[in-house]
Amino acid sequence: MTEQASNGAAQDGQNAQFSLQRIYVRDLSFEAPKAPEIFRQDWKPSVQLDLNTRQKALDGGDFYEVVLSLSVTVKTGEEVAFIAEVQQAGIFLIKGLDAEAMGHTLGAFCPSLLFPYAREALDNLVVRGSFPALMLAPVNFDVLYAQELARMQAEGQASGTVQ
């Protein structure tokens, strides 16, 4: 019985399929509201990064769009130097995963593939805006996903529902 169960699990894993179909910029914006005056000030930046992900199933059920949104607001003193935003998206073919693996793939693995593209797009915008290069540190999407799961579980327990 155990051998049959483990063979079934191996077959399920063999049927799993993951493929990146396309990476694209969904939205991109840059604002320098205090230019050109901001260029004459001492450059002492403070950086605020907002990060968000979302995903949706596309027609056919095995294709998913994952969108990684990054918004960077940089201030020098109290003045906003610039705001740069990107929605970096990808289309992924994902088949044969259980619910837990699918959640992790869409919530952590796919965004980690998109992040280098989003980071490069933001850096390019900032440099073209005549500001120093923006070097965003790598993001551990596995940790962010685990934190989100823990938050959702805590909210479920607080409201009396089981997830």
Swiss-Prot record:
GO biological process terms on file: protein folding; protein tetramerization; protein transport
A Pfam family recorded for this sequence: SecB
This protein's record includes keyword Transferase: no
Record flagged with keyword Cytoplasm: yes
UniProt KW keywords: Chaperone, Cytoplasm, Protein transport, Translocation, Transport
GO molecular function terms attached to this record: unfolded protein binding
This protein's GO CC annotations: cytoplasm
Main location: cytoplasm
Compartment annotation: Cytoplasm
Domain of life: Bacteria
InterPro entries (alphabetical): SecB, SecB-like_sf
General function of this protein: One of the proteins required for the normal export of preproteins out of the cell cytoplasm. It is a molecular chaperone that binds to a subset of precursor proteins, maintaining them in a translocation-competent state. It also specifically binds to its receptor SecA.
Subunit-level organization: Homotetramer, a dimer of dimers. One homotetramer interacts with 1 SecA dimer.
Family note: Belongs to the SecB family.
Protein name as catalogued: Protein-export protein SecB
Lineage: Bacteria, Pseudomonadati, Pseudomonadota, Gammaproteobacteria, Pseudomonadales
Protein encoded by which gene: secB
